[in-house]
């Protein structure tokens, strides 16, 4: 019986790196952010263009323009999620079906808003990636194009880290470097029966 792992963590916590560590241990990983970026170049385009006119260019969603629309009216986030989340779920289900056919012991869904979207009900175990708030802030503000305002807007839409940790089956502390995180990933897989 395949175990579906849901990986989550607030922005700048080291989730992408941790997902790579699971992949290096042979776990198939689906990155929900990458799925969304793909949808922004494919089937979500006409739906987003209809909901938010002027946010697409040359058959692709212009993420800058879409971001401006969302910042002007945060209620638009819900409308966008109503469009995108079902499409993402379809991709996740196809990914999990393939992993089952391939007789994998584990499959990992990397879902930034796992708790916020109720996705924990679709996974067997939840792993939360966390680190100290000052490390998180430093990581995020060093990203190209990131501002304090954008960071605060993203944080406001995410469940507080302490609550995520409390609801997790496992927590990976990414604040002590990649090798320490790798050891934690291996330990989680051992506990789950790898």
Curated annotation (Swiss-Prot):
Read off the InterPro entries from this record: Depp_CoAkinase (IPR001977), P-loop_NTPase (IPR027417)
Q: What class of enzyme is it?
A: transferase
| Alphabetical keyword list | ATP-binding, Coenzyme A biosynthesis, Cytoplasm, Kinase, Nucleotide-binding, Transferase
Give the pathway annotation. Cofactor biosynthesis; coenzyme A biosynthesis; CoA from (R)-pantothenate: step 5/5
Q: Which SUPFAM superfamilies match?
A: P-loop containing nucleoside triphosphate hydrolases
Subcellular location(s) per record: Cytoplasm
One of this protein's GO BP terms? coenzyme A biosynthetic process
> What is this enzyme's catalytic activity, as reactions?
3'-dephospho-CoA + ATP = ADP + CoA + H(+)
Tell me where in this chain the DPCK domain is found: 4-194
Q: Which GO terms describe its cellular component?
A: cytoplasm
Q: At which positions is ATP bound?
A: 12-17
The protein's Enzyme Commission number? 2.7.1.24
Recorded GO terms, molecular function? ATP binding; dephospho-CoA kinase activity
* One Pfam family this sequence matches: CoaE
Say yes or no: keyword Transmembrane helix present. Answer: no
Q: ATP-binding as a keyword?
A: yes
**Which NCBIfam families does this chain map to?**
dephospho-CoA kinase
User: What HAMAP family does this protein map onto?
Assistant: Dephospho_CoA_kinase (MF_00376)
Q: What does this protein do?
A: Catalyzes the phosphorylation of the 3'-hydroxyl group of dephosphocoenzyme A to form coenzyme A.
> What family is this protein classified in?
Belongs to the CoaE family.
The protein in question is named: Dephospho-CoA kinase
Organism expressing this protein natively? Agrobacterium fabrum (strain C58 / ATCC 33970)
């Amino acid at each position: 019986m395949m175990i579906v792992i849901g990986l989550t963590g607030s922005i700048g916590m080291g989730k992408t790196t941790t997902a790579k560590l699971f992949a290096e241990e042979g776990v198939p990983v689906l990155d929900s952010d990458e799925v969304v970026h793909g949808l922004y170049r494919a089937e979500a385009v006409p739906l987003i263009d209809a909901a938010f006119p002027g946010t697409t260019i040359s058959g692709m969603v212009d993420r800058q323009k879409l971001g401006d629309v969302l910042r002007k009216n945060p209620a638009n986030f819900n409308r966008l999620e109503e469009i995108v989340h079902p499409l993402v779920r379809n991709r996740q289900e196809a990914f999990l079906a393939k992993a089952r056919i391939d007789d994998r012991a584990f499959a990992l869904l990397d879902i930034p808003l796992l708790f916020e979207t109720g996705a924990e009900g679709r996974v067997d175990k939840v792993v939360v990636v966390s680190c100290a708030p000052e490390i998180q802030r430093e990581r995020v503000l060093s990203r190209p194009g990131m501002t304090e305002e954008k960071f605060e807007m993203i944080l406001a839409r995410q469940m507080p880290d302490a609550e995520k940790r409390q609801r997790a089956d496992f927590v990976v502390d990414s604040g002590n470097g990649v090798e320490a995180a790798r050891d934690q990933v291996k330990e989680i897989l051992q506990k789950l029966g790898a």
